[in-house]
């Protein structure tokens, strides 16, 4: 069975409130979350999970500071690749900060949950600012329904709540199953301290703060925490220090 490595490509950062990653918690605390595309190394095809988004585009749609670390093209060049070399883009979900470079991958099959694509093309008014239709036009979508193996050792898991069709990505590695979460979170989302557990004994994880269904979001966070040997929160604040996983 194939064993892969995951290469985080940190493209930039976006300022947000910490409560966006942990519902009800630390409201007013500002953090800079990394904007990341993940390359799956070792596959016969060139596979990315999400493609990030340029800072100027993010600031156009979201009222918060953003900055670029490197361009999408520069990040791929370090791997000896160009956007046209990408065969598969797996989208955790279709918020603009995760799919802002996908249109550059002109030869890629874009894997997304059916429920996510349907919602993205006709979002509820509350979430219209997170789905940018012109980012989605002309993409070669490959909709899937539920848990699906994409290639040997790479599987998507339907983990709704953050969005209706959020999907986490389970990847076989030499050190077990690594899961890139399909929802926006940080490592603290999964680390509820004892003092909080005394008040909320059933909170084994925090609920991701941006969600279309908070109950599903909690359940999905709990699900991936239980399944993963290596947990990769989508906006882990330490990703900029990581060259490869594991």
Language-model features: locations:
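Active-site metal-binding loops of divalent metal-dependent hydrolases
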Residues: 51-53, 94, 116, 162-163, ...
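Metallo-beta-lactamase
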Residues: 67-70, 74-97, 109-158, 163, ...
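Beta-strand-turn-beta hairpins that frame and shape the catalytic cleft
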Residues: 1-6, 41-46, 148-156, 173-177
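Cap/insert and terminal regions of metallo-dependent hydrolase folds
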Residues: 69, 74, 175-246
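Short, conserved loop/helix-junction motifs that constitute active-site signature segments
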Residues: 102-106
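Conserved beta-strand hairpin/beta-sheet module of binuclear metal-dependent hydrolase folds
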Residues: 11-74, 168-182, 186
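Short, solvent-exposed loop/turn segments at secondary-structure boundaries
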Residues: 60-63, 123-124, 243
